């Protein structure tokens, strides 16, 4: 993949996301990426519906999206940045660290979550990101995460 291709992608639909990430239903937490700024930042979208399997047990009478899945959506959006930048088939992005995680407000079916992810630093194959999950412009969760790019044959 050329350097130009890695910096000119401004959005990604589900087909492009599935080329970048190995996740599939029911664990693909990003439906669309509406903005990608090179390897600096991205905004991923998750449309939350009551039909998702985790709502059968979390909680049937008052469904709330598990916080860990918000973190996963942040990590997958960050992973798409890494995968797009590296542009090498056969690479995997591993979620390594989570720091400063805060959950501010419940996310419920019908919400549209935006995962705002910004690269904080990169050294070699290690990437650090600050992430905010927002619903209707309000921060519902935030975290600092770390990721590592690994060749599939080394995994």
Curated annotation (Swiss-Prot):
GO BP annotations, alphabetical order: fatty acid biosynthetic process; lipid A biosynthetic process
Class of this enzyme: lyase
Catalytic residue positions: 58
Entry keyword annotation includes Lyase: yes
The entry's keywords: Cytoplasm, Lipid A biosynthesis, Lipid biosynthesis, Lipid metabolism, Lyase
Lyase as UniProt keyword: yes
CC terms in the record's Gene Ontology section: cytoplasm; membrane
Any single Pfam family the record assigns to this protein: FabA
Any GO MF annotation of the entry: (3R)-hydroxyacyl-[acyl-carrier-protein] dehydratase activity
Subcellular location: Cytoplasm
Catalytic activity: a (3R)-hydroxyacyl-[ACP] = a (2E)-enoyl-[ACP] + H2O
The enzyme's E.C. designation: 4.2.1.59
Known role: Involved in unsaturated fatty acids biosynthesis. Catalyzes the dehydration of short chain beta-hydroxyacyl-ACPs and long chain saturated and unsaturated beta-hydroxyacyl-ACPs.
Family of this protein: Belongs to the thioester dehydratase family. FabZ subfamily.
Protein name: 3-hydroxyacyl-[acyl-carrier-protein] dehydratase FabZ
Source species of the chain: Rhizobium leguminosarum bv. trifolii (strain WSM2304)
